[in-house]
Amino acid sequence: KTNKMILPISIKETASKTIYRKSPKSEKTIIEGMNSNGIEEFFNTGDMLGTILTDVFSDVNIYDDDIRLLQRRFVSPIGRGAISFYKFYLMDTLMVDKQECVHLTFVPQNSQDFGFTGHLYVVKDSTYAVKKAIMNLPKKTGVNFVENLDIVQQFEQLPDSNWVLTDDDMTVELALMKGIQGLEVQRTTKYSDYKFDEIEPRLFRLKGNVIKEANMLAKSDEYWAKVRQVPLTKKESSMDVFMNRIEQIPGFKYVIFGAKALIENFVETGSKKHPSKFDFGPINTMITSNYVNGTRFRLSGMTTGNLHPHWSFSGYGAYGTRDKKWFYSGQAAYSFNKREYVLWEFPKHYLAFQYTYDVMSPMDKYLATDKDNMFVGWKWTTVDQMSYMRDATLTYELETNTGFSVKAMARHRNDQPAGMLQYWKNNGTTPGEWDEKNTLVHDITTTELGLTLRYAPGETFVNTKQRRVPVSLDAPTFTLSHTVGLKGVLGGEYNFNLTEASIRKRFWFGSWGKLDITARAGAQWNTVPFPLLNLPMANLSYITQNNESFNLIDNMEFLNDRYASLALSYDMNGKLFNRIPLIKKLKWREMFRIRGMWGTLTDKNNPYKSSNSDLFLFPMRDGMPTSHVMGHTPYVEASVGIYNIFKLLHIEYVRRLTYTDIPGVKKGGVRFMILMIF
């Protein structure tokens, strides 16, 4: 299509049918056949390439106000905002497939905004239906890595006068850098056999929006020859032969080995002929450091679905050079669904038992990655208040095709303070203050039962070897959890009830970017010592973690038993920078964030206002408390960020707006991350 020599490296075919009901509204896609071959066969993390390509190069509907493409939103040339966003030119009147059409061309008012250039062929009658649409990206577009993009859509009028899409072809040329050989992605979609007959109600009762038939991967060559509307080229049809040939190239297996280790962060112990049954990793956790351990060495690994499709085993061993201690973790899990490689493949349905002895920071539970990741180990503050944890957890998780999941947990935990952290009973002369009468507590033990409900309709993700990663954050997410502490059961020392709820939603504003909103609230209903109170979601690393983590709250700085937080992140997609001379040539993009939290500590959990000896004194360093009770003023921090620097780097400056008078607090700071996006 581009008149260039193309070497196919991956091909994927899907045959499906889509059913739609207007009332009550329901739409489902039934995948009848799927066939893939190519470079992705060398990787063992599921259909990662196919999932990403499907999301990045999603279906285009020009009748929508905004077109979702490249994980961005583009203004449609016939959407409600088209008149103010595009310039239109009337070119000619001509015949398209024996129908008289008006030829229009369009270009964005600002070529660097997220929009198209192209042509519309509109039927010259009272319907003004689009007969054909051709859309391209402007040459000076602000989109990264895309050298060229062509979308061609054709529509036909059915005998009943309905207009339908019949052809939807997309060609995208990608390049990391100019002058370097790139990739070409071709997506050819043909629609046929439109029917408006009544559909069996049972089909709409099938679970999920995408239903995969059981034999979709086992279709014969005769089936594909019948349903394939565009024949494969000679190179495409001999893809398996090509893959076998490149495997024979001297040194190729070492290149693939290195690429897989770099991309997947794991080292496999098998080959293509003998698939890996055990993987070593994550690699980036092998050497780290912290205040208690000093330099820390760790070796981790997990079994794969090639060893057993249902049973999974994983764990690690670690050694700290400062405290001279060995640490370990092991997990055994049974998946009720047959898995291809990892435990968390969709839909999750498993029972797991894990036992861990390790050193932990109170903020580790909020990390989106492994706590021993060497990159997040670079902290902006000294984290010297930690704990030795012995944790035995039994987990059951069930996930449905509708986006609803339930997770039940039973846990027995022993928490022994380490480093500069000490647990002192609140039994001194003056409540909340330390003297020689206070009793030092060696450790605390809890027995817990927990239930988490989560609903994320339309969520899409890919499976890596470490975790599940969302492909898109467009889907809303609702979470509700409750944890009960049981005193007297298996040595549990406290009764408690902890409830938390959260909601996250992304809102798009066309060419003006997107707004991510996350709201969270929680309450600890019982009287408990401070290790069981609510802690703010603080990010102690220089690496930006997520939209809702507070970047300038120190370790255990605020202790609450009631809290509510709100995080707003507005990405303008370069709307401002694209209008500044010289700056717009850099293709930088701007982002603004503000995070706030209201919190309180009731008198029953405040050691300064209660003489209850079951409470603990607040954490101290050099005799001074390092944790505080929030007042009526909410904690607020704001940040201004620039991303897409060299198409790679995200940098933001964070400023603390309240509680700036606390001794030793950081009022501002710089955070960054590596971020490659279109």
Regions found by a protein language model. Name each.
Residues 315-319, 351-359, 408-414, 449, ...:
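Transmembrane beta-barrel strands of outer-membrane/channel proteins
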Residues 287, 350-368, 375-384, 439, ...:
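C-terminal outer-membrane beta-barrel translocator/porin domains of Gram-negative envelope proteins
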Residues 146, 180-181, 327-330, 363-370, ...:
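Outer-membrane beta-barrel translocator domains and adjoining extracellular loop/strand segments
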Residues 449-455, 566, 667-678:
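Outer-membrane beta-barrel "beta-signal"
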Residues 134-138, 278-289, 299-300, 305, ...:
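Transmembrane beta-strand segments that form the barrel wall of outer-membrane beta-barrel proteins
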Residues 433-445, 531-644:
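Outer membrane beta-barrel transmembrane domains
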Residues 268-278, 306-311, 337-349, 403-406, ...:
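Short loop/turn motifs that connect adjacent beta-strands in outer-membrane beta-barrel proteins
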Residues 1-101, 107-116, 173, 177-281, ...:
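Structured extracytoplasmic
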